[in-house]
Amino acid sequence: MGFLTILKKKQPDPAINDYFVKVSNAAQRIASMIQFTSEYEKIGVNAPVWQDCSTVVDTAVKQTPLEKVVVKNDLTHGTEVFADPLIVKVFYNLMDNAIRYGGKITTIRFSVEESGEDHIIVCEDDGVGVVAEEKVKIFTRGFGKNTGMGLFLTVEILSITGITIKETGEPGKGARFEIVVPNGAWRTTKKDT
């Protein structure tokens, strides 16, 4: 990408600008795919471990360029999931997608619900949401406006320990991702007060 920056500064002919933009976009896509490949090959390398959900979300927040978006982490300390150590990437991807595609998003909220013996970690935002026709497709490799790899990677990371994810939001009212953690893959530990 360094040579493209130099070329842009020295570019004498504005007529060539369209070609420059296409080459620059292609280079960015290639760089993103290389990064994805690097991350994908790490899935399952390390054994799953118990991880505090609230702490993992806090770590992901620090890695995410939030701009003016507020993240509300309502997950309580002491609720743990048994997952691949890359689970932090799951929460990063959800926030990154909300910021990229949510429109005029102001808030992302993480919470937990119970459904029978399962725990559901909810990530919801106040953006534009996901249209009904794309609720399943967004998890497919290559689908999307950027690299199409983030939510595919999310599914792969979660599936290591039988955790699933689905989008259940209402289009026009925000996205809502439900991470379904089956019985045996979550636990509550004693909290310090």
Model-flagged regions — what are they?
Residues V130-R141:
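Short conserved segment of the HATPase_c
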Residues N17-K68:
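Conserved DHp (HisKA) dimerization/phosphotransfer helix of two-component histidine kinases, i.e.
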